[in-house]
Amino acid sequence: VHEHGHVVGDVNQNSFMVGRDSKVVLIDSDSFQINANGTLHLCEVGVSHFTPPELQTLSSFVGFERTENHDNFGLALLIFHVLFGGRHPYSGVPLISDAGNALETDITHFRYAYASDNQRRGLKPPPRSIPLSMLPSDVEAMFQQAFTESGVATGRPTAKAWVAALDLLRQQLKKCTVSAMHVYSAHLTDCPWCALDNQGVIYFIDLGEEVITTSGDFVLAKVWAMVMASVAPPALQL
């Protein structure tokens, strides 16, 4: 979408559909910000919980031009949801008096609960939640960049950066020796899912089935080359 000069704009959990074959499809495209033949058709809607901090104070998106970096905030949030069991990165245990009252306010003030400096920001992760340390340090740093002031100043991780980082993580997963349902990053010594199980927080019920990872012969670069080689349909004559 970005490579064609367009912006999704209203990025949220209802922007995508995932098929049984893991194919992801963008939907709700009638609200995209489209740049067509020099005319910019704006995206004038948005979901507050997915709106980046720098736009939280806007009373309306009418007449406002979105950017790729705004999209990249929503993308990082969706990835965080997937990796952390639906948890919102700006939701946690308040450390200061005015934190935790409204999600929009915490987003506005960059109160990323999992930040390396979260004590200063005023929120910390909820007890017995999935720890950020489950991820390699480079992926942790990408979330730090996406959800703090740095993302506004120097840009948030792009979709390409996320694809590369997560594909590398996929190739470095290892299986738990206790539960066939658990896989985790090879940088960890112990299984983080077992640690959560021992605290009474169970994400994966062990049914005796083995998790099949997608390492095999899958090569992302080859798949992406096929995607990029596809021919776009002709433009509509309106």
Q: Model-derived features: where do they sit?
A:
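Protein kinase-like catalytic domain
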Residues: H2, L83-F84, F147
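Catalytic-loop of the protein kinase fold
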Residues: H2-D21
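Conserved catalytic-core motifs of eukaryotic protein kinase domains, centered on the activation segment
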Residues: A36-G38
